Amino acid sequence: DNIYFQATGGGVCFGGGEPTMNADFIIEFAKLIPKGWKLTLETSLKCSYKTIESLAPYVAEWIVDIKDTNKTIYEKYTGVSSEIIQQLCYIKELVQVDKVIVKVPHIPNFNTNEDVKHSIEILKGIGITHIKEITYMEHITHITK
């Protein structure tokens, strides 16, 4: 695998759920992988500043799903409060801004096109340069008898 990853610039991505909850494991894993492998974290940043700081030296790329910058929309969708803007500003102090990709989803029944545009403007205003506007895909379950 090492030859393949070295040749392609590949690596490992931790995502699903909230990977920052396993920060200690990710750090130990990062210490074991061959030099040159890219470690990516796909996260909602629902973690402490200390966790962000501990992961920063090991994570080559941060993919951050913000849901929405509007705190009311965020809380209605997730059920928890948000410090996402403050956390993104903190990450920018620790890593190069081009290593941070922020996903802004259109979430049916939670945010509007205007909400998404507003979130993108806020992100640009704090200096985020890699912004991906995405369409939220609801999982469809088919039950057969």
Kindly give the residue locations of the regions a language model identified.
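Conserved AdoMet/S-adenosylmethionine-binding subsite of the radical SAM
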Residues: N2-H139
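Binuclear metal-ion centers of metallo-dependent hydrolases, dominated by the metallo-beta-lactamase
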Residues: I143-K145
